[in-house]
Amino acid sequence: MAEEAKSKGNAAFSSGDYATAITHFTEAINLSPTNHILYSNRSASYASLHRYEEALSDAKKTIELKPDWSKGYSRLGAAFIGLSKFDEAVDSYKKGLEIDPSNEMLKSGLADASRSRVSSKSNPFVDAFQGKEMWEKLTADPGTRVYLEQDDFVKTMKEIQRNPNNLNLYMKDKRVMKALGVLLNVKFGGSSGEDTEMKEADERKEPEPEMEPMELTEEERQKKERKEKALKEKGEGNVAYKKKDFGRAVEHYTKAMELDDEDISYLTNRAAVYLEMGKYEECIEDCDKAVERGRELRSDFKMIARALTRKGSALVKMARCSKDFEPAIETFQKALTEHRNPDTLKKLNDAEKVKKELEQQEYFDPTIAEEEREKGNGFFKEQKYPEAVKHYSEAIKRNPNDVRAYSNRAACYTKLGALPEGLKDAEKCIELDPSFTKGYSRKGAIQFFMKEYDKAMETYQEGLKHDPKNQEFLDGVRRCVEQINKASRGDLTPEELKERQAKAMQDPEVQNILSDPVMRQVLVDFQENPKAAQEHMKNPMVMNKIQKLVSAGIVQVR
């Protein structure tokens, strides 16, 4: 149950529904309160909703449950950064690195927290972006509340909150300036009186360019312009990709990368183009670069997972020739550790399935299978049943379509008392070849040993349809009838009757019959109302169910 709730939480988180994710993770925690991963996942969900206090609490609980798990300190550091407690964030990342010194995510987090700590001491606006108060103020103000529904605005404010010096890059964004005014409790621009006095002059003059409230350095201005040009190139690349003009798409994505190397989506997009073009080596190279650069930039886990998934897809394409799916499987598994995406999980399952099928094809050898089966027969005759099972199992691996190997192994399991395993092999015989009579005799014998006499009789009767004169089947039916009649006549000892009834009550069919209100009334009528019982006996469905209860020892005929 906890695992199911966790899976639902992961799916909701993947779709961006963080509130629902929190609900599911909370349900999972209630079912499994000592699972540190659940607290870690809920911490990430709280952080995504800017609820950093709750994120911090869950991060601390994660570490309490699993103090040697480095990811817990990554969650703790992220929560402290969200609360603008940069000293504590630095300490958290350092503690995580003591456990896992090579963890790139912790290294990036430490560098980020250290930069933010330095900038927070020199930036006059840093107090405006402190912790959850920033999001509460923006939510409370009607003018900025609508902006929080815009993903690019939320992303921008997160960047500024992480490093207040980034404010200079977004001074032309009216939404950012509006938000800054709300946070500082001031209004940027002239008063309404000044606006009225200047109205006439404004109507006569050409509108002047909007002045930047704060001057950008030349380097910052150039960086912003490059980012804008890069996004434009990306947009044109997307258009070309949709038109399947892959050559032009590659050109645009390459230009975008040259203009801005801090956005790995240009690399993953170009990798997607290479994948479509069949240039798998180039695709893999771009994906590797995206992962490496993404870790340096501390990019979103989803972006890194996307790059790994794309690499895995390229490796699958290549494996169709090389027949080596292991690299693709490993890559998909890495992607899932970054971000559990249903599409990636499906790709992993498909790759594992194909790998297994290939292994079975390569291992298939009827000649060796027959040799192994004969070896098993030799050990069976010597009553060395465990050794016989070993050789029959190898024969099945070499040729999974040979019913004789399953039949022989079923006989071994029966001798060893492993009746459920023997029953499974006998049913496999019938599945592979319904006309293979030995499968019915094996299955019927095992069911008889399990004291499931009604089921054994059905199996023998099914076998008689394929071989009406088979003496083994006829004898099997006779033995089953004798056992069933013993129960119906009351010839069983109290212990035998109790055992048979207890076994019958485990049968879902018997449970359904006894829980059916109509059948319960029928049983009462058979005891108390002979006239009604006579009417019931005319109904074939009712009598079949009565016979089932008689066979199971639940009902006795006096």
Curated annotation (Swiss-Prot):
<dbReference type="Pfam" id="PF13432">
    <property type="entry name" value="TPR_16"/>
</dbReference>
<keyword id="KW-0346">Stress response</keyword>
<feature type="repeat" description="TPR 2">
    <location>
        <begin position="37"/>
        <end position="69"/>
    </location>
</feature>
<feature type="repeat" description="TPR 8">
    <location>
        <begin position="369"/>
        <end position="402"/>
    </location>
</feature>
<dbReference type="GO" id="GO:0051879">
    <property type="term" value="F:Hsp90 protein binding"/>
</dbReference>
<feature type="repeat" description="TPR 3">
    <location>
        <begin position="70"/>
        <end position="103"/>
    </location>
</feature>
<feature type="short sequence motif" description="Bipartite nuclear localization signal">
    <location>
        <begin position="227"/>
        <end position="244"/>
    </location>
</feature>
<dbReference type="InterPro" id="IPR019734">
    <property type="entry name" value="TPR_rpt"/>
</dbReference>
<dbReference type="GO" id="GO:0070678">
    <property type="term" value="F:preprotein binding"/>
</dbReference>
<protein>
    <recommendedName>
        <fullName>Hsp70-Hsp90 organizing protein 3</fullName>
    </recommendedName>
</protein>
<feature type="compositionally biased region" description="Acidic residues">
    <location>
        <begin position="209"/>
        <end position="218"/>
    </location>
</feature>
<feature type="compositionally biased region" description="Basic and acidic residues">
    <location>
        <begin position="196"/>
        <end position="208"/>
    </location>
</feature>
<dbReference type="GO" id="GO:0005634">
    <property type="term" value="C:nucleus"/>
</dbReference>
<keyword id="KW-0963">Cytoplasm</keyword>
<dbReference type="InterPro" id="IPR041243">
    <property type="entry name" value="STI1/HOP_DP"/>
</dbReference>
<feature type="repeat" description="TPR 1">
    <location>
        <begin position="2"/>
        <end position="35"/>
    </location>
</feature>
<keyword id="KW-0677">Repeat</keyword>
<comment type="function">
    <text>Mediates the association of the molecular chaperones HSP70 and HSP90. Mediates nuclear encoded chloroplast preproteins binding to HSP90 prior to chloroplastic sorting. Involved in acclimation to heat.</text>
</comment>
<dbReference type="GO" id="GO:0010286">
    <property type="term" value="P:heat acclimation"/>
</dbReference>
<feature type="repeat" description="TPR 10">
    <location>
        <begin position="437"/>
        <end position="470"/>
    </location>
</feature>
<keyword id="KW-0802">TPR repeat</keyword>
<comment type="subunit">
    <text>Co-chaperone that forms a complex with HSP70 and HSP90 and preproteins (e.g. chloroplast preproteins).</text>
</comment>
<feature type="repeat" description="TPR 4">
    <location>
        <begin position="136"/>
        <end position="173"/>
    </location>
</feature>
<keyword id="KW-0597">Phosphoprotein</keyword>
<dbReference type="Pfam" id="PF17830">
    <property type="entry name" value="STI1-HOP_DP"/>
</dbReference>
<feature type="region of interest" description="Disordered">
    <location>
        <begin position="191"/>
        <end position="232"/>
    </location>
</feature>
<feature type="repeat" description="TPR 5">
    <location>
        <begin position="230"/>
        <end position="263"/>
    </location>
</feature>
<feature type="repeat" description="TPR 9">
    <location>
        <begin position="404"/>
        <end position="436"/>
    </location>
</feature>
<feature type="repeat" description="TPR 6">
    <location>
        <begin position="265"/>
        <end position="297"/>
    </location>
</feature>
<feature type="domain" description="STI1 1">
    <location>
        <begin position="131"/>
        <end position="170"/>
    </location>
</feature>
<keyword id="KW-0539">Nucleus</keyword>
<dbReference type="Pfam" id="PF13414">
    <property type="entry name" value="TPR_11"/>
</dbReference>
<dbReference type="InterPro" id="IPR011990">
    <property type="entry name" value="TPR-like_helical_dom_sf"/>
</dbReference>
<dbReference type="GO" id="GO:0005829">
    <property type="term" value="C:cytosol"/>
</dbReference>
<keyword id="KW-0007">Acetylation</keyword>
<feature type="domain" description="STI1 2">
    <location>
        <begin position="507"/>
        <end position="546"/>
    </location>
</feature>
<keyword id="KW-0143">Chaperone</keyword>
<dbReference type="InterPro" id="IPR006636">
    <property type="entry name" value="STI1_HS-bd"/>
</dbReference>
<feature type="compositionally biased region" description="Basic and acidic residues">
    <location>
        <begin position="219"/>
        <end position="232"/>
    </location>
</feature>
<feature type="repeat" description="TPR 7">
    <location>
        <begin position="305"/>
        <end position="342"/>
    </location>
</feature>
<dbReference type="GO" id="GO:0051131">
    <property type="term" value="P:chaperone-mediated protein complex assembly"/>
</dbReference>
<dbReference type="Pfam" id="PF00515">
    <property type="entry name" value="TPR_1"/>
</dbReference>
